[in-house]
């Protein structure tokens, strides 16, 4: 009698449990992906055994889902050999509730697919003219710079208004920053460190290219900043009255080059390999010789032991005009690391 009463209840509980288990499996089955490629396949696996609802609740554009519950070996083959998983279902078909993050907005493209595009808020920008970025490039306005920042240069910022210049003339730096022309003859706005600790070791002394001994790298950077143009490092240690490069001891990997104009030597790296030069890379050096590039000029200096410096870009026979490029091909070093040139 007892068994007859319990058996129907047990069957009911087993049936309910089985239904819940199958429902759980049906909801959980599937894989969540972070993006959908141009070929329509899902890429960058986020999690397995995830329902579409859970996968798509983030609101992130690009998140996609596949229904197939397949072993890891199949997922591996899809990702490595087939460019992603087939039957990819994008979470977002429209821009509704899409979160693109700051400085971006969702927009339907020509294929009627939602895409996040750069759309910085430029409504509060008062200066409408060109600006010079900290990358040494000129942008037509601050809004264009913000778009470039959005597209992959997160550290990009405005350093001063107007086109990037080769001199500090007419450069108005914001706040307490000062204009400095670096060793590549580009003007930058930097904050001068006016307090340097006193040297505690003779190893901290540096000889500048101006023949002055500085207490440390901090003191040399400070002098550079206050002067408004690069001084550069001649060699480590206090400056000496050298008669030739034989009197100067360079650190490993450097060679002494003699500056005959001032009767001083400086240590320089001489292991640079020069790549293929472009026609607009030519420079006129201090020996009035045209070199295919600044690198080639440095190689010539290293081979002769005589210091060469750039007089101006282009051929020595060309007419030099004070022009300002809209954009530089190469991004100059604006960190003011002390170098030998």
Swiss-Prot record:
Glycans are attached at residues 72, 124, 288. Binds directly to activin and functions as an activin antagonist which plays a role in neural induction. The short isoform is a more potent inhibitor of activin than the long isoform. Specific inhibitor of the biosynthesis and secretion of pituitary follicle stimulating hormone (FSH). InterPro entries: Fol_N, Follistatin/Osteonectin_EGF, Kazal_dom, Kazal_dom_sf, TB_dom, TB_dom_sf. GO terms for molecular function: activin binding; calcium ion binding; collagen binding; extracellular matrix binding. CDD domains: KAZAL_FS. GO terms for cellular component: extracellular region; extracellular space. This is Follistatin. Induction: By activin.
